[in-house]
């Protein structure tokens, strides 16, 4: 019987009938599935905003290309920095106004600061006294608060956290929000739950301001009042090459919680090297000549509200602190896959 059935399969007439039968069944099942899908989606008007194009500005945004060859400094997947000529023309008047005012202020400061005395030169030869402190950033006005930008995973369509940075009645800054570790089910994001505030104090035409005047001080000084969470201080030092755009130096900021202020003095020698937030094997001391920004990040994997109040950020000098660098580093052998 099996041999007879196999022989019938080899006949062209029978084979054609069999193919026609299965193709008919497949067509009917596909049409049924399509009609069922259409009936389920009928009346659905929701729109997904996961693929919305991020607005790109010419100046003052974190998405500005560093140069024309590498328009994606953060390495974001699917990032498109292109914008139309119409958007560029519409933004030019505001850009010309803001950048012109900033340029005039720079020229005014350059001529007003002409003096025989050079404070930084005096500091370089040892004129910074013991226990001398200098406040660099206050938050008592809205103009000073505008120097800081905030962000969280929901801003990048990668999570559900929220954050805000506002002035308080006491002339301080309140960095608050909610951390959510719920992962977005898009098949790309693996973990979520972070929020940050970062200094974006730049010169005219988006030129960097370096924190080189801190080089003669031994500690970073902060006056904060937290909620018991552990934050992270980051000194950002990206250079011109693309493989250095994620370079930063980090140190934890442990807050006590409660109503009392805490004065945190963090030695610059204890900041460790990180790239995109990841600790590196090769460690070296932070070079403040290359540091152009400072940030505070929360990513402790704890869901819930957070609140950090900041009075000021500055520097402090302790002449008894002689430590150059607090950490050992892994030294590669002479012959290795990374070269000499």
Swiss-Prot record:
GO molecular function: unfolded protein binding
GO biological process, one term: mitochondrial electron transport, NADH to ubiquinone
Subcellular compartments: Mitochondrion
Keywords: Chaperone, Mitochondrion, Transit peptide
Gene for this chain: nuaf-1
Record family assignment: Belongs to the CIA30 family.
InterPro entries per UniProt: Galactose-bd-like_sf, NADH-UbQ_OxRdtase-assoc_prot30, NDUFAF1
The keyword Transmembrane appears for this protein: no
Organism lineage string: Eukaryota, Metazoa, Ecdysozoa, Nematoda, Chromadorea
Primary location class: mitochondrion
Function: Chaperone protein involved in the assembly of the mitochondrial NADH:ubiquinone oxidoreductase complex (complex I). Required for normal growth and reproduction.
Pfam families to which the protein is assigned, alphabetical: CIA30
Protein name: Probable complex I intermediate-associated protein 30, mitochondrial
GO cellular component: mitochondrion
